[in-house]
């Protein structure tokens, strides 16, 4: 599998996890926006960057955060759990990178409205 195919496959894994919990999702094809996935549930919008291994540059992070704030959406990063070959973890972006504060938090299923 090419890196593109692996990334696309993980985007679909993320979408399946969200749809199983009642989210309506749409994938942004060919990375034309800073968000890979748009998800909505109970009137709340979530923009998601699906990163198989969680790697994201500071510039991409900050651009994604600004994009979400402008749209009124919750900025989320999904990644594969460390050392695992399956599953999805969700992280809420809290701050810009380099602010001296922890810029993310791991979301439990309850935090993300998944139960």
Task: Provide a role label for each language-model segment.
Residues 23, 44, 73-74:
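Short coil/turn segments at beta-strand junctions that form active-site/ligand-binding loops
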Residues 36-37, 77:
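Short beta-strand scaffold segments in enzyme catalytic cores
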Residues 17, 66-67:
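Alpha-helical scaffold elements within enzyme catalytic domains, especially in hydrolases
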